[in-house]
């Protein structure tokens, strides 16, 4: 008779343990889903901010280009215009990365592609901020 009780208690303990393991797995998978959703939201917000920044930089670059376009330029201003045109092309290539870098990305894996675009964005944003900052500062001084 004691053997039956031992078997029954062992069975109850094993089933309770199995249920707790199953509940732990479910809560972990729910946490993973929530973390993934949070990451998607963060990426979406980051993408919107980056898109807005790109649009603002394009607008500023176009405004600077039109400012420099209607007057005689010095050699230095001519170089600035060339850089602005190159930056505009790079910004456009960020808007359409599939078409612009199709040749560059053949044979790369996804991590290398992501790193390539991150480096490209950093390479573009640094000079753009410098190029846009100098003329805007000059325009503000003239206006003010």
UniProtKB/Swiss-Prot annotation:
The modification Isoleucine amide is found at residue 143. Disulfide bonds: none annotated. Pfam families: Bombinin (PF05298). It comes from the Eukaryota. It is found in: Secreted. Expressed by the skin glands. Coiled coil: none annotated. GO terms for biological process: defense response to bacterium; defense response to fungus; killing of cells of another organism. One of its GO terms (cellular component) is extracellular region. The keyword Isomerase does not apply. Keywords: Amidation, Amphibian defense peptide, Antibiotic, Antimicrobial, Cleavage on pair of basic residues, Cytolysis, Fungicide, Hemolysis, Secreted, Signal. Residues 1-18 form the signal peptide. InterPro entries: Bombinin. Residues 19-43, 73-122 form a propeptide. Belongs to the bombinin family. Maximin-3 shows antibacterial activity against both Gram-positive and Gram-negative bacteria. It also shows antimicrobial activity against the fungus C.albicans, but not against A.flavus nor P.uticale. It has little hemolytic activity. It possess a significant cytotoxicity against tumor cell lines. It possess a significant anti-HIV activity. It shows high spermicidal activity. This is Maximins 3/H14.
């Amino acid at each position: 008779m004691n053997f039956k009780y031992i078997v029954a208690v062992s069975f109850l303990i094993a089933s309770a343990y199995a249920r707790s393991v199953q509940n732990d797995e479910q809560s972990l998978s729910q946490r993973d889903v929530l973390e993934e959703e949070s990451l998607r939201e963060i990426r979406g917000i980051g993408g919107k901010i980056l898109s807005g920044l790109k649009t603002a930089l394009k607008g500023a670059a176009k405004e600077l280009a039109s400012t420099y376009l209607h007057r005689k330029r010095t050699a230095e201003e001519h170089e600035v215009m060339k850089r602005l045109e190159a930056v505009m092309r790079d910004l456009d290539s960020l808007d359409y990365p599939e078409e612009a870098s199709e040749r560059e990305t053949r044979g790369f894996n996804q991590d290398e592609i992501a790193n390539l675009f991150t480096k490209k964005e950093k390479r573009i944003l640094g000079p753009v901020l410098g190029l846009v900052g100098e003329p805007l500062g000059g325009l503000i001084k003239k206006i003010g």
